[in-house]
Amino acid sequence: MDSNTVSSFQDILMRMSKMQLGSSSEDLNGMITQFESLRLYRDSLGEAVMRMGDLHSLQNRNGKWREQLSQKFEEIRWLIEEVRHRLKITENSFEQITFMQALQLLLEVEQEIRTFSFQLI
């Protein structure tokens, strides 16, 4: 993972944690938690791809990795829809910018995970 992506994740997570969205703050905290979990998963897939032969240890360690991968794609789709919804309802420009950047980053991460998974298949 390149340093720009790391800083993008850190920047968006920091800005999202500063937002006050009233009654939906629990939902936002859940989004932040899922975002962080997604980043860690993407990083671990990327590391597995970097180490040739890790495919076999990944498959041995986790016989259900395809199922796990499918679940992560569902999480990404949910987060994308949630971010799009937040983007539509917010009128605060700081929040709009943050959610637009989060959406762009989610789409990039989805593509990276797809690329990693194709290399692992």
UniProtKB/Swiss-Prot annotation:
GO BP terms, alphabetized: exit of virus from host cell nucleus through nuclear pore
Protein name in UniProt: Nuclear export protein
Function of the molecule: Mediates the nuclear export of encapsidated genomic RNAs (ribonucleoproteins, RNPs). Acts as an adapter between viral RNPs complexes and the nuclear export machinery of the cell. Possesses no intrinsic RNA-binding activity, but includes a C-terminal M1-binding domain. This domain is believed to allow recognition of RNPs bound to the protein M1.
Subunit structure: Interacts with protein M1. May interact with host nucleoporin RAB/HRB and exportin XPO1/CRM1.
Family: Belongs to the influenza viruses NEP family.
Gene3D superfamilies reported for this sequence: 1.10.287.230, S15/NS1, RNA-binding (1.10.287.10)
Main location: virion
Biological source species: Influenza A virus (strain A/Chicken/Victoria/1/1985 H7N7)
Stored SUPFAM superfamilies: Nonstructural protein ns2, Nep, M1-binding domain
InterPro entries: Flu_NS2 (IPR000968)
Organism lineage string: Viruses, Riboviria, Orthornavirae, Negarnaviricota, Polyploviricotina
Keyword Ribonucleoprotein applies: no
CC annotations in GO: host cell nucleus; virion component
Gene name for this UniProt entry: NS
Keywords noted in UniProt: Host nucleus, Host-virus interaction, Transport, Virion
Motif (Nuclear export signal): 12-21, 85-94
Compartments, as annotated in UniProt: Virion; Host nucleus
